[in-house]
C-alpha cells in the first residue's frame, strides 16, 4: 500500500492507494501549526491508523508547500511554521522505521497528472497551478525533476518577458514578490494577478469570477481585458514551452476552471514559439484537489 500526505497550512490529508492507484482509505485532520513534536506525532498516528485499516505497513510519501533544502533535509515552508527548518523526512523515517519521501506539493500535483491513464504515454509533462500564486512542476518519463536546490518548478519566480511589456505597458508596476524580487510572473498571470491587473487597468477591484461572468456576458471592458490577459499568458508560457518542449501542458488552480483558456490559448501561443514548434496538448487537470495525495503516494509507486 502507498500512503500519500497532502500537508497544508490548515489541514493534513492522507490518502491510501493500492498498486493500481485506487484509493482505499482516507482521513483529514487539522495541521498543528506551533509545535514540531505535535506535528510529528500527528503524522505518526495517522500512519499507524492507516496500517491498522489496511493490515500492512504502507510506504509514505508527503507533499509540502515548500522545499527540502540542504544535506540535512531541513524544510523551507512558510505555510507550515511548525516544520520550518526541521528535518521532517529524517525524523519521521526514524520514528516509523521506514522510508519516507517528501516533495513539493506542486510537483506532486504534476506527478499525479502525468500518471493519469490518459496522459501516461506523454514523456514530458509540464504542469502549472494558476491559483493564488503560480506553482508548477516538470515530470520526465514519469519522474519529477527537482533540480539541485529543489526549486526546478518554481516558474512563478521567472521575470516578466520583454514582450509582456508590449501587452500590459512598459509602465506596469514591478510588483514586489514574496520571494524578495520584483516583476515575478506569478504576480501577473496567477488568479490573484488576474484580479490585480484588472484593477490596475480599470481602477475597479473585482473578483475573477465576476470578471469572467462579465466577459461571458459580452461586457466591453471585460472582453478587452481577457483578450490582453490571454496575450500576456501566452507570452509568459511561450518561454516555458520553448525551454522544456513538453508533450502535454496541464493546468490546475482556480483560473484553470476558466474553460475559454483551452480555446483561446492555442491560438495565441504559436507566435511565441519557434516556427518549427508544435503546440503541446493543453488540458485541465483531471484529479483536482485529490491530485496532492495521489501524487505524494506516487513518490514511491513510481518506482514500480
UniProtKB/Swiss-Prot annotation:
Keywords: ATP-binding, Carbohydrate metabolism, Kinase, Metal-binding, Nucleotide-binding, Transferase, Zinc. Its EC number is 2.7.1.59. Transmembrane segments: none annotated. This is N-acetyl-D-glucosamine kinase. Zn(2+) binds at residues 157, 177, 179, 184. It comes from Pectobacterium carotovorum subsp. carotovorum (strain PC1). Catalyzes the phosphorylation of N-acetyl-D-glucosamine (GlcNAc) derived from cell-wall degradation, yielding GlcNAc-6-P. HAMAP family: GlcNAc_kinase (MF_01271). One of its GO terms (molecular function) is zinc ion binding. The keyword Zinc applies. Gene3D superfamilies: 3.30.420.40. Pathway: Cell wall biogenesis; peptidoglycan recycling. One of its GO terms (biological process) is peptidoglycan turnover. It catalyses: N-acetyl-D-glucosamine + ATP = N-acetyl-D-glucosamine 6-phosphate + ADP + H(+). InterPro entries: ATPase_NBD, N-acetyl-D-glucosamine_kinase, ROK, ROK_cs. ATP binds at residues 4-11, 133-140. Pfam families: ROK. Belongs to the ROK (NagC/XylR) family. NagK subfamily.
Amino acid at each position: 500500500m502507498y500512503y500519500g500526505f497532502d500537508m497544508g497550512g490548515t489541514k493534513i490529508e492522507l490518502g491510501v492507494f493500492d498498486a493500481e492507484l485506487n484509493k482505499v482509505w482516507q482521513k483529514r485532520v487539522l495541521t498543528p501549526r506551533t509545535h514540531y513534536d505535535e506535528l510529528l506525532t500527528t503524522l505518526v498516528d495517522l500512519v499507524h491508523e492507516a496500517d491498522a485499516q489496511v493490515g500492512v505497513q504502507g510506504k509514505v510519501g508527503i507533499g509540502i508547500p515548500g522545499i527540502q533544502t540542504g544535506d540535512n533535509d531541513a524544510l523551507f515552508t512558510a505555510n507550515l511554521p511548525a516544520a520550518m527548518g526541521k528535518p521532517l523526512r529524517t525524523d519521521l523515517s526514524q520514528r516509523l522505521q521506514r522510508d519516507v519521501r517528501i516533495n513539493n506539493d506542486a510537483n506532486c500535483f504534476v506527478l499525479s497528472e502525468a500518471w493519469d491513464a490518459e496522459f501516461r504515454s506523454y514523456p514530458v509533462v509540464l504542469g502549472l497551478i494558476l491559483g493564488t500564486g503560480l506553482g508548477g512542476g516538470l515530470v520526465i518519463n514519469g519522474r519529477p525533476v527537482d533540480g539541485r536546490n529543489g526549486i526546478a518548478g518554481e516558474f512563478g519566480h521567472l521575470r516578466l518577458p520583454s514582450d509582456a511589456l508590449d501587452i500590459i505597458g512598459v509602465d506596469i508596476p514591478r510588483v514586489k514578490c514574496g520571494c524578495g524580487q520584483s516583476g515575478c510572473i506569478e504576480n501577473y498571470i496567477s488568479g490573484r494577478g488576474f484580479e490585480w491587473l484588472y484593477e490596475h487597468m480599470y481602477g475597479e477591484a473585482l473578483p475573477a469570477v465576476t470578471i469572467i461572468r462579465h466577459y461571458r456576458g459580452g461586457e466591453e471592458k471585460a472582453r478587452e481585458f481577457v483578450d490582453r490577459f490571454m496575450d500576456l499568458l501566452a507570452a509568459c508560457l511561450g518561454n516555458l514551452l520553448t525551454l522544456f518542449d513538453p508533450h502535454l501542458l496541464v493546468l490546475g488552480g482556480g483560473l484553470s476552471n476558466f474553460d475559454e483558456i483551452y480555446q483561446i490559448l492555442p491560438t495565441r501561443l504559436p507566435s511565441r514559439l519557434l516556427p518549427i514548434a508544435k503546440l503541446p496538448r493543453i488540458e485541465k487537470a483531471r484529479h483536482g484537489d485529490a491530485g496532492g495525495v495521489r501524487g505524494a503516494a506516487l513518490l514511491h509507486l513510481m518506482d514500480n
